[in-house]
């Protein structure tokens, strides 16, 4: 009995051959749109393209598209918004694509813009540092995000699968919701930060936050260094948490399930750190009144009697604290 695979191949072979002969199969195309109308906001809706927003060399706005003829593409201005849309072509042969990857490149004059909205199904997103937006909302299914622009208001990034990298001069409230992937934030100023990840690592270096930092991670490691904020709340379930030079002016809370909590030159007015299985090992910048608890493990903390409360607990693990 012939396999199902061989039967499908025999059925599709003449179809593909006919499509190629008639020029109906999906090949590549290149389009360029010059945008002469003025606009403030930018909205991009793509199905299977990488998206790049880059500064133009001539001060003009152009949109370049390289992709499959199986896709329809258009760029126009409507009600003060530059709308860029990629949709599937209505063709019986649109599923026959020989283009490996599609790409949308938006060349913008450097300067300030209103809202930036990007909705992508499959593809990477890169936004250069030469722009300032009032707000940014990125929603991706599969693809990496590299965001370097300044945002005066809120920035929201939702993704199912992919890595997220940010290096911004300034951002308002930053919210990241990611199912699978890593988050990296470097040299940024934010009014608040909220990160929620199911599986992946978090790495933050050089963050100044006016308000609260909240990080929730199910599986993965959290590493933070040179971070200042008002309140910090870090919750992990499986994986170590490493903090270096992280200072909260108010509350400093860390909760872990399985994994060590390690910190150096950190501080907060009030500190609460707990882990179920793992050590708590750290160095603080100021005296604290310590309360400690471990079921299985050793405890060694300074015998100071001034400062805020430092509550440390682990079920299985050691507690070792020094004061710098």
Can you say where each PLM-predicted feature lies in the sequence?
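Acidic (Asp/Glu) and glycine-rich low-complexity loops/linkers
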Residues: 2-12, 16-120, 124-140, 144-159, ...
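Short N-terminal helix-initiation segments at or just after the protein's N-terminus
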Residues: 262-264
């Amino acid at each position: 009995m012939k396999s199902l695979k061989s039967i499908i191949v025999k059925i599709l072979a003449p179809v593909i051959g006919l499509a190629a002969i008639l020029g109906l199969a999906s090949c590549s195309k290149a389009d360029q749109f010059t945008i002469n109308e003025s606009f403030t906001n930018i909205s991009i809706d793509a199905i299977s393209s990488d998206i790049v927003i880059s500064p133009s060399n001539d001060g003009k706005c152009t949109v370049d598209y390289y992709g499959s003829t199986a896709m329809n593409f258009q760029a126009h201005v409507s009600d003060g918004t530059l709308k860029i849309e990629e949709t599937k072509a209505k063709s019986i042969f649109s599923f026959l694509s020989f283009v490996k990857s599609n790409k949308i490149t938006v060349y913008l004059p450097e300067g300030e813009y209103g809202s930036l909205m990007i909705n992508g199904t499959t593809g990477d997103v890169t936004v250069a540092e030469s722009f300032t937006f009032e707000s940014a909302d990125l929603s991706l299914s599969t693809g990496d995000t590299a965001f370097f622009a300044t945002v005066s208001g809120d920035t929201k990034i939702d993704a199912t699968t992919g890595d997220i990298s940010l290096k911004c001069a300034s951002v308002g409230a930053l919210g990241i919701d990611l199912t699978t992937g890593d988050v990296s934030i470097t040299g940024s100023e934010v009014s608040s930060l909220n990160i929620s990840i199911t599986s992946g690592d978090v790495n933050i270096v050089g963050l100044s936050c006016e308000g609260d930092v909240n990080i929730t991670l199910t599986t993965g490691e959290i590493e933070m260094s040179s971070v200042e904020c008002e309140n910090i709340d870090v919750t992990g379930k499986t994986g170590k948490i490493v903090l270096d030079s992280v200072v909260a002016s108010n509350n400093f809370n860390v909760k872990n399930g399985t994994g060590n909590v390690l910190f150096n030159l950190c501080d907060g007015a009030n500190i609460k750190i707990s882990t179920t299985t793992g050590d708590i090992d750290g160095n603080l910048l100021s005296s604290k009144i310590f309360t400690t608890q471990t079921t299985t493990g050793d405890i060694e903390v300074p015998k100071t009697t001034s400062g805020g409360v430092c509550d440390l607990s682990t079920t299985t693990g050691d507690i070792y604290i020094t004061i710098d």
